[in-house]
Amino acid sequence: MRKFTAFACGTGAGLLTFYLTKLNEPKAAVHNSWTRSEKPVDPCALWDHNWDLRDPKSLVKPVKNDLSQEQNRYNSELEKVVPKHARHIILIRHGEYLDVGDTDETHHLTERGREQAKYTGKRLCELGIKWDKVIASTMVRAQETADIILNEIDYEKAKVKNCAFLREGAPIPPQPPVGHWKPEASQFFRDGARIEAAFRRYFYRAYPDQTKDSYTLLVGHGNVIRYFVCRALQFPPEAWLRISINHASITWLTISPSGNVSIKYLGDTGFMPVNHLTNRIPRAAKNVV
């Protein structure tokens, strides 16, 4: 009986000690692994409010002293440079085309590519947008796509601007690299500067004298559009090749008066029949001479 009592007491004391030890252990905080909420925000993830060098505070001389006159001067000048309306930039990728011959002049839309462009034009018409500007890449497939779209929307063809900066190219070496597409470093050097210049030409917040929201239609190319999306949203531009957009798709970016940028559509082709959804050159017509 004594042995049993001693065993029971020993076991109870052991369990009590174990319980008290566990009770006093510090509790580890549980975090959702994907949020990284226990770490400070990486500097590269912070939004650059002056990305276009048009932040109103950067355009006005700062306050020099605490005098009310100086503060009034600052507020008055600041009010004059504050945008009041948004800029909507709608990007259209060209339709499916034939990679025939060695020059751009022979790279015409396929019949399906022409139909894709018509569907896109009809969709843009349905959206009821009042266009302020229509600008097209000077490459044949973009010109043909723009011409078909213009038959469907309310915009005079004579007012269309052509821009060589929007031509297709290699914007920046992608991450991760891919084995099937490796342009020379010289091509990235040449095309990258041009495509970045195109971004700076068309992406900026509204000027203070803009009296209403504006709508700009850009007809261009897959690589250029994907690079623009990354740059506008301040994602790493090297990520552009991780995005895939269909032929004649609609991508819609909005630059608010504050300079914040949001995306409404990314490569939208939901308005097309499924047999018209393509994103690559037809294999049977690739590099045909």
UniProtKB/Swiss-Prot annotation:
As for what it does, the entry says: Displays phosphatase activity for serine/threonine residues, and dephosphorylates and activates Pk92B kinase. Has apparently no phosphoglycerate mutase activity.
Instruction: Write out the GO biological process terms.
Output: positive regulation of mitochondrial fission; protein dephosphorylation
Q: Which SUPFAM superfamilies match?
A: Phosphoglycerate mutase-like
Pfam families named in the record: His_Phos_1
Q: Which GO terms describe its molecular function?
A: phosphoprotein phosphatase activity; protein serine/threonine phosphatase activity
Q: What is this protein called?
A: Serine/threonine-protein phosphatase Pgam5, mitochondrial
Species this chain originates from: Drosophila pseudoobscura pseudoobscura (Fruit fly)
The protein's Enzyme Commission number: 3.1.3.16
Kindly give the Gene3D superfamilies that the UniProt entry links to this protein: Phosphoglycerate mutase-like
What taxonomic ancestry is recorded? Eukaryota, Metazoa, Ecdysozoa, Arthropoda, Hexapoda
| Family per similarity comment | Belongs to the phosphoglycerate mutase family. BPG-dependent PGAM subfamily.
